[in-house]
């Protein structure tokens, strides 16, 4: 089950464009366990700068996040909407625009986060595939940035050009199902943005 908090539709005549998919907790925002209310949400250092740079380079920016707190009964979808309104407010205040937020409320039953239990929940590609369909995105030219193996594997499973892992979130509990050498790991979202822009021929800031 995939839900969407916001969506800025792309014009129907627009050519498919590349995107950077961002995990929320531990990547775009500081990792704080289950974020159940707006006051708990803090942007990760460099998030605003990174979004501005990516959009200036022609990328759509889409947040894709597993939110199992809903499936666990810890919060409602209305409460999550309040958290996402706070996220949008903080980003909008700094002129950092995102195109959409997709989330999966399902609760995992498998402890190994590299196993695809559901197409909708990362590491399944469902959120990325739905975003590509609704926003007219070119997955083959798109990237995934996240702190967990489930994030980067979602990018691989969706057929993205690349996935970059950041060290700002929670360390994953299990080894990847694919070679770790295939996944570049950097310190934070700023360094990950440098990787994406460098690979695409844009000069790093």
Model-derived regions: residue spans:
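Substrate-recognition element of Asp-dependent hydrolases with the DxDx(T/V) motif
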Residues: 47, 51-90, 96-110, 155
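Short acidic-hydrophobic, aromatic-tinged amphipathic segments that line or gate anion-handling sites
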Residues: 183-192
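Conserved Lys-Pro-Asp/Glu-containing loop-to-beta segment of HAD-superfamily phosphomonoesterases
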Residues: 119-152
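Asp-based phosphoryl-transfer active-site loop
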Residues: 15-31, 65
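Basic, amphipathic juxtamembrane/active-site segments
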Residues: 32-49
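Short, solvent-exposed loop/turn segments at secondary-structure boundaries
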Residues: 39-40, 73-78, 115-117
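Acidic, Mg2+-coordinating phosphoryl-transfer loop and its flanking beta/alpha structural elements
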Residues: 145-184
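Non-catalytic pre-domain segments flanking phosphatase-related domains
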Residues: 1-22, 202-205
């Amino acid at each position: 089950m995939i839900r969407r908090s916001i969506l800025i539709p792309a014009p129907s005549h627009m050519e498919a464009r590349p995107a950077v998919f961002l995990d929320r907790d531990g990547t775009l925002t500081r990792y704080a366990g289950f974020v159940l209310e707006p006051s708990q949400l803090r942007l990760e250092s460099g998030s605003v700068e990174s979004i501005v740079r990516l959009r200036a380079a022609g990328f759509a920016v889409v947040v894709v996040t597993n939110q199992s707190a809903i499936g666990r009964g810890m919060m409602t979808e209305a409460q999550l909407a309040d958290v996402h309104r706070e996220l949008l407010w903080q980003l909008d205040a700094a002129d950092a625009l995102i195109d959409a937020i997709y989330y999966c409320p399902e609760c995992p039953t498998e402890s190994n986060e590299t196993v695809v239990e559901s197409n909708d929940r990362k590491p399944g590609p469902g959120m990325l595939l739905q975003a590509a369909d609704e926003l007219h995105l070119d997955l083959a030219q798109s990237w995934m940035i996240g702190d967990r193996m489930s994030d980067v594997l979602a990018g691989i499973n969706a057929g993205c050009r690349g996935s970059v892992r950041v060290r700002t979130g929670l360390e994953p509990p299990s080894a990847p199902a694919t070679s770790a050498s295939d996944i570049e790991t950097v310190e934070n979202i700023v360094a990950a943005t440098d990787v994406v822009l460098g690979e695409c021929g844009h000069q790093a800031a």
